[in-house]
Amino acid sequence: MARPTVFITRKVHYEALSLIGEECDIDLWEQDKPPPHQLLCNRANNVDGIMTNVMDRIDVEFLDVAANLKVISQIAVGLDNIDLVEATRRKIPVGYTPGVVSEVTADHTMGILLASAHRLAESERWVRNGQWKIAFHPLFWLGSEVHHSTLGIIGMGRIGSEVAKRAHAFDMKILYNSPARKPLI
């Protein structure tokens, strides 16, 4: 019996490739840019599974030529690029990775918050340009205090909740908008 073939539209971690390769033949798109839609469609008729990214359009045109497709796996949280109604109609299961970037996105959010409040990008450019050698007012570079400040969060889903957890470490007052009250906030 032939092994199933999976088309992977992005470079993924070696360990993931190794695991998939134990059970399947892999057709890997190795370029940094997303594969063109026509290329996806051209390869669709020879694969049993596809591992996609949000930049790959999995639409009726693709599904029409993907006669052997048994599964779609999205390496992302969102599914806007996949025609879920059509995949469901054809009984092709679609997997995705909910929550996979919630914590790192919250970390990044706090990093941007701190960098903005303390004018880190401006300060870095200022030092690189040698401007630290001239007279300046030192309070200018202190920026705004994050500790004990108030933070507004629009949407208290996975990412918003993770941001709130981090904000608590700074004793920040949290104001948020969400369809449901979050008792832990």
Q: Which positions does each model-derived feature cover?
A:
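N-terminal glycine-/charge-rich "phosphate-binding" loop or analogous flexible N-terminal tail
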Residues: M1-V47
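Phosphate-coordination loops involved in phosphoryl transfer and adenosine-cofactor binding
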Residues: R3, L69, H147-T150
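Structural detector of well-ordered beta-strand residues that form the stable sheet scaffold
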Residues: F7, D27, V71-S73, P93-G95, ...
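Short gly/ser/thr-rich secondary-structure transition/capping motifs
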Residues: E30-P35, N53-V54, N129-L139, L184-I185
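Phosphate/diphosphate ligand-binding glycine-rich loop within oxidoreductases
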Residues: N46-R128, G143-S144
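Rossmann-like dinucleotide/phosphate-binding beta-alpha-beta segment
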Residues: L139-I185
